[in-house]
């Protein structure tokens, strides 16, 4: 995985261009042989509209939500896409301007209104976006597109039509939830979001949405708070993008990237700011690990500490001999990585992209080990006794346990990100293989496989080809953990070929099985699922 491609032609810029939705599915041109058992839909979310009228969106996470679908059946493939009819999208299309403030783009009052109307608009308070561009996941028999606010949007996975908007605040005490829930085999959904805890201080709630019952009753009505994690700072919650789960525990990593609540509450009504303006870094905090028992939900008051890093994606967590093993895609330091994901940065020429990446936090895949049985008299001793890892946990005199990781992969400005595993069989369990999107100075230019035990790596890459997060689909008669395929949408702009394709790789060694090319460019996608 140390090989590095150069991109002087700047073809990666194409994934940040707006596109039009499709009136109906279009056929793909298949080369290779798609496995007969691979019959289903690849659903992907991402930004598809990067400007409205004359007004641009500024950040990667601002573009309007576009739902993509590749249908696979009997060796044939079709591609379809539609914009989700969120309030943010519909109002923007109606008024031909940015109407609701997005992650890094501020919406301003209509310039056509008189001064008194504009003044009143500023003081109406916060209008939270429902632009659900990040992920899509099932709740019961339904599918919901999501971002990280309190709004999720039900969509039809067959027609891609927008069904309805759901406000999670009507059911749960959370200000928002992550776009990375954990879903168990019975359909139980777990997620995490910040909330107001005791004495009006901030906290983080693990929420549980039960599986669909025989009577088909509303699952949201039966959702509940399972356990609460305290916040290290009363009015500054950490940014949370994902969390970990094992058979018996939840793992929450609290990073030094903070949301300044005072800025957040005054941004829209007074200062005219956006979400990115409300982030700041606590350069003295480091990073804290929290644990909670799963059933019954109970916070475990062990004080795990380590040096500062950003974390967006957990790879996997599992329990072993009284320890919890936590594998993460980290970015070193306390500076917020999202500062480097403004579209102006991502669209720069190749040499400028490389210069920016030199200044950014550096990526590293790390393994941390958290002991469950801790005794104060063991000060100064490494509490980790697992024979297969060099990760350590040392009790300090102040009662904290200092963690040092084992590095599973590290390459200068080469990230292993958007990780996937054989989720249905190995989530929360001891595992061997992870799959990821390789970022070269933030440019996605390879698909990676990592053996977390041996640290062996495999890659797929082609010149001027820009893949997406690879999703693992297990073979129906699988005996081995990596017996299956990887699905990734690849953009390959140029005059000599069709500009995008669905790539199907053999998960064991990342050799190509087939590709399904389409005659339209496909903008960047973030996350998604495979629906059999």
Curated annotation (Swiss-Prot):
One of the record's GO cellular component terms: membrane
One Pfam family it belongs to: RPE65
Tissues where this protein is expressed: Retinal Mueller cells. Detected in the inner retina near the ganglion cell layer, in a region where the Mueller end feet are located, and a weak signal is observed between the outer nuclear and ganglion cell layers (at protein level).
UniProt keyword Protease, yes or no: no
Catalysed conversion reaction: an all-trans-retinyl ester + H2O = 13-cis-retinol + a fatty acid + H(+); lutein = (3R,3'S)-zeaxanthin; an all-trans-retinyl ester + H2O = 11-cis-retinol + a fatty acid + H(+); all-trans-retinyl hexadecanoate + H2O = 11-cis-retinol + hexadecanoate + H(+)
GO biological process, one term: retinoid metabolic process
Residues carrying lipid (S-palmitoyl cysteine): 112, 329
Domain of life: Eukaryota
Main localization category: cytoplasm
InterPro entries the record matches: Carotenoid_Oase
Entry's Gene Ontology molecular function annotations: all-trans-retinyl-ester hydrolase, 11-cis retinol forming activity; all-trans-retinyl-palmitate hydrolase, 11-cis retinol forming activity; beta-carotene 15,15'-dioxygenase activity; metal ion binding; retinol isomerase activity
Record note on cofactor: Binds 1 Fe(2+) ion per subunit.
Keyword terms, alphabetized: Cell membrane, Cytoplasm, Hydrolase, Iron, Isomerase, Lipoprotein, Membrane, Metal-binding, Palmitate
Family of this protein: Belongs to the carotenoid oxygenase family.
Name this polypeptide is given: Retinal Mueller cells isomerohydrolase
Gene name linked to the record: rpe65c
